[in-house]
Amino acid sequence: MKSWLLFFLFIINFEANAQLDTLFWFVAPEVAQSHGDRPIVFRFATLNQAATITVSQPANPLFPTQVLNLVANDAQTLNLTAWIDQIENKPANTILPYGFQISASAPIMAYYEVTPTCNCNPDIFALKGKNSLGTSFIVPAQNFLNNASYARSGFNIVATQNNTVVTINPKQAIVGHAANIPFSIVLQKGETFSAEAVSILANQHLSGSTISSNLPIAVTLHDDSMSGAPYGGCADLMGDQIIPNQVLGSEYIILKGYLNGPDKIYVVAIQNNTQISIDGVATATINATETYVHTLSSPTVLIQTSAPTHVLHTTGFGCEVGGAILPSIICTGSNTVAFVRSTNEFFALNIKTGVSILLSRIFSKTLIPSSSGIITSKIMRSGCV
């Protein structure tokens, strides 16, 4: 039986509930079935209030609206696999009705998980609620690992209101559109669009692509079956909801994972002449849409920038690579996080010293000493080929 874990982070002089909300928008990426793309699930958790959760696709009458009732301090999983062909956002360069609207009567946590029965290509997409919605985005992406021949990378857009005009300027060629030539689409509420890189090569990924809209949208990044060859083999999915430009930060602390080699950190500027300092040392200056790559071999690093930036961290264990878009230390995610450990593979918590944490498993609790600290903002899973 899969068990839920709740992490309660007690942070002095700090309050942030970046993933605790009553309204979420999400579009699920296409994941290669040949490597493992199912089951797919939503996982929900409540805190001290009961909640009724409604999951719908406003633009798709063929998807049956789902209603879940959770008591306080509860968690439930909604298996979506039966509808996977009207959930995964394919084909690319096509307006589709596959966007999710999730509403709750009280604040909840939510994430989407690809959890293949083969344990071979899983990932978690933490839903960020209002912090995922905006009208201006720059896409962060890794440029070190190629995709497998059957997989692609890209980003996916969902509209939250009717008559949403979205302008996309792809940094590299995507299906149906050349690089550096802006184009616009019009989406209705719940409609989606997939921008997919035409190449599997890492240097043809879409970092620095820009997305703007007249009304709020949400954007999902995906990088399917990244080759872990530099670390000894494997191939794994990475994805996350992108943070809009208006809520980015300029100071980040990153903890190294457990790969057979260094982690990679990708810093993407949204303003010209953005200066980057690594552990207090001025290192580089980049312009808007440009990417600076830092190779992380030490246990931790402090990255500071003169203007807000995106920071994408790729890490994992062994040759299994995953990744996440990081929150700045001004907004370090939620003070409570719930998740399911879906496999019995390697599992670790990276803990920064200085703050007490209460680790609560249903009906059993362990206190992590105050000499420990805060859990990193996203706990990732990786699988095997």
Model-inferred region functions:
Residues 19-351, 355, 361:
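Extracellular lectin-like interaction modules
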Residues 352-354, 358, 363-382:
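Alpha-helix boundary/capping motif
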Residues 1-22:
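Bacterial Sec-dependent N-terminal signal peptides
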Residues 10-12, 16, 349, 360, ...:
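Generic detector of N-terminal low-structure segments
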